[in-house]
Amino acid sequence: MPTLITGEKTPQQMKDMRECGRMLATIYDELRQRVTAGMSELDVNEFVAGRIRDFGAEATYLTDEVKFPGVICVSTNEQLVHSFPTDYVFEKGDVVSFDLVIGYHGMKTDSAFTMVVDEEPRGAKKHLLHATEQSLYAGIDAISGEGTRVGDISAAIEAVLKKAKLGIIRELVGHGVGLEMHQY
């Protein structure tokens, strides 16, 4: 269970969180451009490890107690989430999710994204990616400032996914930013 951490962040912590998020977004932008058929999951892991070092950050997946055998989760096709990077070589049309936690000056950012390798998504793949992206935006739109409850955000996300006839695996939801990966 994550540690309950309360209180305001200092201006420096806020700056470090933003910088950590910028690093994570940059790595994801680079992966969107770089991942192609013929590249392996281990190639991705090596690239991401190098970029994290370049930024002067650290890979902090999953927790300090769990020694994850890589710096990024790479879940391909039917794999659900949190898969270890392997020597699997991507093929055109693979649906791949990347999940990464970066630490920087004591702050952590945790995020994931999904893409289709070397093709424009069509059919079920397009439906999945579009619906999940729309659910993200619905969750963001549900944030109305101080006092917004996680349940309000979750309900907005769930409504979009239900309408799209997609389910939620309740034990595997959420990403975060703060002193811990899933700060509450």
Stretch-by-stretch model annotation:
Residues 1-184:
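Active-site neighborhoods and metal-handling regions in enzymes and metal-associated proteins
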